[in-house]
Swiss-Prot record:
Protein name per the record: Ribosome-binding factor A
Subcellular localization: Cytoplasm
Similarity section: Belongs to the RbfA family.
A biological-process GO annotation: maturation of SSU-rRNA
Predominant cellular place of this UniProt entry's protein: cytoplasm
UniProt xrefs under Pfam families: RBFA (PF02033)
Gene that encodes the chain: rbfA
PANTHER family hit by this protein: RIBOSOME-BINDING FACTOR A, CHLOROPLASTIC-RELATED
Any Gene Ontology CC annotation: cytosol
PROSITE patterns: RBFA
Keyword Acyltransferase: no
GO molecular function: ribosomal small subunit binding
Native source organism of the sequence: Citrobacter koseri (strain ATCC BAA-895 / CDC 4225-83 / SGSC4696)
Domain of life: Bacteria
Known role: One of several proteins that assist in the late maturation steps of the functional core of the 30S ribosomal subunit. Associates with free 30S ribosomal subunits (but not with 30S subunits that are part of 70S ribosomes or polysomes). Required for efficient processing of 16S rRNA. May interact with the 5'-terminal helix region of 16S rRNA.
Amino acid sequence: MAKEFGRPQRVAQEMQKEIAIILQREIKDPRLGMMTTVSGVEMSRDLAYAKVYVTFLNDKDEDAVKAGIKALQEASGFIRTLLGKAMRLRIVPELTFFYDNSLVEGMRMSNLVTNVVKHDEERRVNPDDSKED
């Protein structure tokens, strides 16, 4: 029977949990004043590199997002050290942080659909108003 998840996926899943804990408890950078969430981790096949996707609670300010990503990238060595101790990996992957805007885009798309449905309902209730457009 084939494995459902390979080693890179299992390590990435565990790494996502551990990085979230490290960011919550260990990192005290003021540039990360906003709540940081690890939304995903992608591992290379040889487990040497990891792309860490993060979102921020207050992500309306683009400069704050850039500063947050820069702070995470600067702290990646410290995070790798803690990660190596927590996960007992022989080789801790090189971490690269990316801002994940999929959550924001999903909410934007949901709002657009909601507005279209609401507008459609209003047109059904008042069909005379649509002829004036």
